[in-house]
Amino acid sequence: MTTSLLALLLLLNASCTTEDAIETIETADLSIDINLANETDWPMADEVLQLINEHRNNLGLSGLTADHGYASAYAVDHTKYMIDLERISDDCFADRARALKNNGAISVGENVAAGFDTAQSVVNAWLNSPSHRENIEGNFTHTGFGVMQTDTGRYYFTQLFYKK
C-alpha cells in the first residue's frame, strides 16, 4: 500500500505544471524584427486585401488598412513556421495576439491557408469557411500579411486582423 501511494504521488507530481512554468509562458519574449514584414509577397497580399475590402464594402463595412509593420512581421514569422512544418497551423496565436495588443490592438483575429496560387482562390476559400469569414467580416480596422512562396511554388498565407 505504501508503494502504491508513493507511485501515485510521483505520477501526480510529474503531470502538474508549476506556477513558475506558467509564469515563464506568460512572460515569453514577444519581440520581433519588424524588417520581416518586407519578406511578404506584397503584390499577392495587396490583391488579397483588395478582394477582402471589396467584400467588406459590399456589406457596408469599412475597409481594412494594411499594416506593413508589426502585424506583418508577426504574420511572416508565423508563415515561415508553417513552411517549416509543411502544413498550416494556428500554433501560438495567443502570443501573436498578445504582441499586437501590447502594440495597441484591442482585438485580434487570424486566418491561415496554404496551397492556393491566386488571391481570388484563397479569399474564396476563406469566405466559404464560417470561422474565416467571421474574421474577414469582423470588427477590425487593420491587417497584416505573411504571404510567402516556397521553393516548390506552394503559397502559405497568414493574415492577422486587429482593431485599434
Segments the model singles out, each with a brief description of its role:
Residues 16-164:
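Functional surface patches built around histidine and acidic residues
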Residues 1-4:
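Bacterial N-terminal signal peptides that target proteins for export
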Residues 11-15:
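C-terminal motif of bacterial Sec signal peptides marking the signal peptidase cleavage site
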Residues 6-8:
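Classic N-terminal secretory signal peptides
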